[in-house]
């Protein structure tokens, strides 16, 4: 009996540790699209080739990871596609926090004039149009 308990005890301890482990936040994927003004493309690319450290820090502080922006020309029009993963627990609150950051606001004043919102976003006073995920392979 003593030998059985000695063999089972470490397993029980492992199960307790696994059960008490802090759960990792669920990651939510987001993607958007917008137009890019051809005469502002070089400026936009230069800004993102040399992002401001405070802006990158704010993005990370707001639980954003694996953030990327891609550019594509389609029929003579430039488009931007943005993708990110959100690992926080309150996306709206984090976005409000980011929007209240003076350095981020200053950054957006540099990048927004480079972009050309699609009609649905423009109608809402937004820059980026939401997209719908149609496939994901974890």
Positions of predicted regions on the chain:
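Short amphipathic alpha-helical segments
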Residues: 40-65
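Short beta-strand micro-motifs enriched in acidic
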Residues: 70-74
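Bacterial N-terminal signal peptides that target proteins for export
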Residues: 1-9
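Bacterial Sec signal peptide processing site at the extreme N-terminus
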Residues: 21-26
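C-terminal motif of bacterial Sec signal peptides marking the signal peptidase cleavage site
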Residues: 16-19
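An amphipathic, aromatic/His-enriched active-site/gating alpha helix that lines ligand/cofactor pockets
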Residues: 58-65, 85-129
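Short beta-strand-to-loop capping motifs
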Residues: 34-36, 83-86
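Terminal, regulation- and interaction-focused segments at domain boundaries
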Residues: 27-41
